[in-house]
Structure formats: structure tokens, C-alpha cells
Amino acid sequence: MTLMMLIALVAVTLTACGGGGNKKEEAANNATKTEANAKTEEGKEDGGAITAEGLMETKGGFMSIATGGTGGTYYPLGGALSNILNNAGVNYTATAQATGASVENVELVTKGDAEIGFIQNDVAYYAANGTETFDGNKKSSLRGLCCLYPEVVQIAASAESGIKTIDDLKGKKVAVGAPGSGVEVNVKQILDVHGITYDDLGKVDYLSFAEAADQIKSGQIDAAFITAAIPSSAYTELATTHDINLIPIAEDKAKELIEKYPFYVNLHITPTEYKGQDKELSLVAVQSMLVVDEKMSDEDAYNIVKLLFENLDTMKESHARGGDIALDKALDGMSIEVHPGAQKYFDEVKK
């Protein structure tokens, strides 16, 4: 039995006994395995179906993957990534940890309580630069591994409100997410390039999208912002029972936004995404991404991105958004310094 296997066995034994430990052990003890994690145990018995050639030598070790809520997108993708790492034959012991998502994951990774974190690239930018949510709390050790898929800023407006453009939000009752949340920052930035402030709105409500959807249904508000992968189940549910307009952003305004905040990307969604949408629309999105701390070895960072991009089928099987992850888009929207180990892999595949 190798030293790392012995350590892993001891850690499991302590967990079963309810023993205490340092923060990393607590994170492991509190982690909830996804279905993909559970399948990992079976995969280890038969070797799994993971492509793992050409990896760099490493000591392996425990990898806590900070994701998001169990009902979100990050959690199943984190489970799939843990499955890939556990079956790579490099003695990694990985587990997906349910968390409060982006902001919390930055803290977990930079404090050493998680090795890998799923976050939005705008949050990564704020953390690395000490702005917005991280004003006075700069996380200079945060490093990027890769970008994954777009999380689209969507504006849902009741048809009866008459809102068709962002300028039409003036004088209307609008939900902007929780105070200080990533969604609210997106709202302020988008309104800013349109010359709109909160004072121009009829009413500003700080609501989650689930709360906002209920108030759109009851007529208490006219529109709500949500930043999420498309299609969003919450938006889909709302559009199924009520006439809803998805509000586009003009391409010239999208360009202006991207010039000012380079972590955004412009994209077009097809008319088939949501009920009631009858034409292609221009929207903007931030990118989901994987981050680590600068202390992670080059070898581990290299192995993680190599294993991820050479086993994308496993990611796709865990969640539809896994199918949006692509090597040729891995650095699109990268908002912070790339870990040198990850950069080594990207440089190799370009040759």
C-alpha cells in the first residue's frame, strides 16, 4: 500500500467515526457525493473509461472540488470531474463539495479548503482585482484553469408590461437579484452602458429569480434579471405559464459592454430556446470557469485540464451544459492569470 493510499484510508476512517480535523478535513467530511462520485467507486474496480495518457508525474492526493447547490449546474459537473480524476490512475482522490457557488468558492480555494472551484469569470475578475464583491479583499493568488460554458444574462419581462428593449425598463418595476450578488453587478453594468441608473427605474426589487418569477406572475413587478445557462429551468417554467418577452441587448451596446468589461462575451440564441421566443436574439454572457490557487503544482494543474478536455463525454453525460465545453474556447473570457501548468497544456495542443 502506497503512502497516499494509506493516508486516504485513514481519512475515510476518521470521517466514518465523525472525528474532527483541520479545515480541509472538515470540507471533505461535509462534502456530498453526486451520483457521478458514487459511480467512481465502481469505475475504480474496472478501470473506468477515462482517457489518461501522457500525464505528468505527481504525488496525487486529495482534491476537493467546490461546486454550487445540489440543484444547480456546477454540482453534477463537479461530480463528473471528480470521476475523471479518480479514474486517471494518478492516485487522485477527488470529491465534489456542495457550496454557495462562486463567491464562496473563491474563499475556499484561496484559503486552501478546496483545490478546485467552479466560479463565474466576472467574480474571478473582481476577486483578483479586489473590486465589487471583493472590495478590500483582493485574492491575488487566484489562478484560472479554463473557461467552460456561457452563463447568460437574461431579462424576463411580462408581455403586458410592454417592455421590448432595455431602454423600456425606465419607469418599470425590476428585480435585480440579491444585494451585492453577481447578478446585481451584471444589472448595473448593463444599465450603465445604456445610460440608465436605478433612479430611472420605477422600482428596484432585490429578489432571487424564483421570487421574481412569482411576482411577475402576480403582476407585482414587470421584469427580472437572471444570470444562468440557457435554457434556464426557472425561466422555462415561467414562460410555460405566462406570456414572457426575453429582452435582447443591441450588438453595439454589447460591444461597448465588452470593451469596458472584457469578461463578457456576446452570443446569439436561437428561437427554439424558450416558449414565446420567435426570433434569434443578441445577448451577453459571463463564462463559468475553473479556478485554483497559485500554490497548486504545475503538474496537477496540467493534469486536470488535460484530463478534462480529453474526457468531455463524461462531462456531457453529467449535464447538458457539459456539451458546451470545448478546447477551442477554453480561454475565451479568461479574466485572470492562467495557472502556468494549465497554460503548458494549452501551448502543447496548439502546436
Where is each model-derived feature located?
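Bilobed "Venus flytrap"/periplasmic-binding protein-like clamshell domains
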Residues: G60-A88, Y92, A96, P150-S218, ...
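Pocket-flanking alpha-helical
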Residues: G79-N83, T95-G136, I155, A210-Q215, ...
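A structural signal for short loop-to-beta-strand junctions that line the ligand-binding cleft
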Residues: D135-L148, E273-S282
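Immediate post-signal peptide segment of exported/extracytoplasmic ligand-binding proteins
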Residues: K23-I65, E160-K173, T240, P340-Q343, ...
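Bacterial signal peptide processing site
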Residues: G18-N22
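A bilobed periplasmic-binding-protein/Venus flytrap-type ligand-binding module shared by bacterial periplasmic
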Residues: V152-I163, L257-P262, V286-E299
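C-terminal motif of bacterial Sec signal peptides marking the signal peptidase cleavage site
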Residues: T13-A16
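An extracytoplasmic/periplasmic, membrane-proximal ligand-sensing/linker region
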Residues: V204, E211, S218, A228-L246, ...
